[in-house]
Amino acid sequence: MYTWDAEQYKQSSSNQKKWGTELVSKLGLKGNEHVLDIGCGDGILTAEMAKILTGGLVVGTDSSEEMINLAKKNFHEKDYPNLSFIVKDARKLDFDGEFDIVFSNACLHWIIDHAPVLQGIKRSLKGGGKMLAQMGGKGNAAEIVRITEQLIKSERWARYFNDFTFPYGFYGPEEYKAWLTDLGFKIVRAELIPKDMVFENRQKLAYWIETTWMPYTQAVPEHSHEELIGEMLPELL
C-alpha cells in the first residue's frame, strides 16, 4: 500500500479531473440514481455528481485514508447530505445490489488483478445497473515507462529495485471484454482512447511524477526522491 500526499495529488491531477468531468457527462444522470465512485481521490468529481443527484446519492470510496480525509474536509456532509466517503479497497467491495451506476476514473490501473474488482462491481449493482470506468490501458505512458524502467536498472538506482515488479495493471479491450462477458455484463463499449497530458509548468510535472509514479519514488529513500525525479524530468520536457 502506498502513502498518498493528498494535497500534492490535488495540485497535479488537473488532467485526471478534466477526463473525469468528460466521463461524468457521459453518464446521463437523471438525478435520482444511486452511484458508487471507486477511487474517488479528493472527491471533486464525486461532489459534482452529488450536485446533480438531488433525488439520489453518491458514495465515494478510496483505499487511501489520506484521500478520504481530504474529501471529507472539502465536501462536508452538512453541505452535501447525499454524499458520503468511505475508506475501502476496490478489491474488497462488500455492497450488495445497492447502486444503479458504478463509476471509476483514473483508478483501476493501480490494481494488477482486476478480477476481484469486477466481481465486486457486479455484486454492487442493482439489476440493470451499469458500469462506466476509465483507466490507464495497454500501452499507457509508454515513453515514461521506458525511461523509468531503464533508469532503475542503472548503477545509481538498481539496488533499490532488486525485487521490484511492474506495479500497474494496464490492460487492453480484448482482456476486458473477456472478463466482463464472463461476469454477465452486456458490453456497450470497451476501447482504448488516446489522451495527451499537459502540465502548466515543470513543478506540476514533478508533482505528477511523485504521485502517479510513487511505486518508483517510494522505493528509494525519501531524501533521494528529488534526485530520482530530477533524472526523469529532462527526458519528459
Could you say what each language-model-derived stretch is?
Residues 1-33, 44-48, 70:
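Conserved class I S-adenosyl-L-methionine
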Residues 24, 47-50, 72, 118-122, ...:
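A structural alpha-helix within SAM-dependent methyltransferase catalytic domains
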Residues 34-38, 42-92:
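Class I SAM-dependent methyltransferase SAM/SAH-binding core
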Residues 91-101:
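A short acidic, Gly/Pro-enriched loop at the edge of an enzyme's catalytic core
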Residues 101-114:
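A short SAM/SAH-binding and catalytic strip from SAM-dependent methyltransferases
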Residues 115-130:
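A short glycine-rich, Lys/Arg-flanked "PGG" loop and its adjoining helix->strand segment in the class I
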Residues 130-199:
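Conserved catalytic/acceptor-binding region of the Class I
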Residues 189-237:
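C-terminal helical/coil "lid" or tail adjacent to the Rossmann-like core of SAM-dependent
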